[in-house]
Swiss-Prot record:
F(1)F(0) ATP synthase produces ATP from ADP in the presence of a proton or sodium gradient. F-type ATPases consist of two structural domains, F(1) containing the extramembraneous catalytic core and F(0) containing the membrane proton channel, linked together by a central stalk and a peripheral stalk. During catalysis, ATP synthesis in the catalytic domain of F(1) is coupled via a rotary mechanism of the central stalk subunits to proton translocation. This is ATP synthase subunit c 1. The keyword Ion transport applies. It is found in: Cell inner membrane. Keywords: ATP synthesis, Cell inner membrane, Cell membrane, CF(0), Hydrogen ion transport, Ion transport, Lipid-binding, Membrane, Transmembrane, Transmembrane helix, Transport.
Length: 91
């Protein structure tokens, strides 16, 4: 495997792990909010507002994972070093 193939696999695995954690967290948050509304329907607006803020914070982790994976794919700081190594090996 060359450097760029490893970058693609690394970005894919990183995104999978990052979204898996956020998906589990969001599922647990929604489950708890639905249980809270079922127990106290009068507090539904407060519960939903708090849940939406919490979901936005949880989703930010997935966005950070996406940004890191995009940096790995398109703005990799080690790309030039890898290309120089390939050139020296090819000579």
């Amino acid at each position: 495997m060359n450097f760029f193939t490893m970058c693609v696999f690394g970005a894919a695995i990183g995104m999978a792990i990052g979204t898996l954690g956020t998906a589990i967290g969001q599922g647990m948050a929604v489950k708890s909010a639905v249980e809270g509304v079922a127990r106290n329907p009068g507090a539904a607006s407060k519960i939903m507002t708090t849940m939406m803020i919490g979901l936005a914070m949880i989703e930010s982790l997935a966005i950070y994972a996406l940004v890191v994976c995009l940096i790995i794919l398109f703005a990799n700081p080690y790309k030039d070093i890898a290309l120089k190594m390939v050139e020296t090996v090819a000579k």
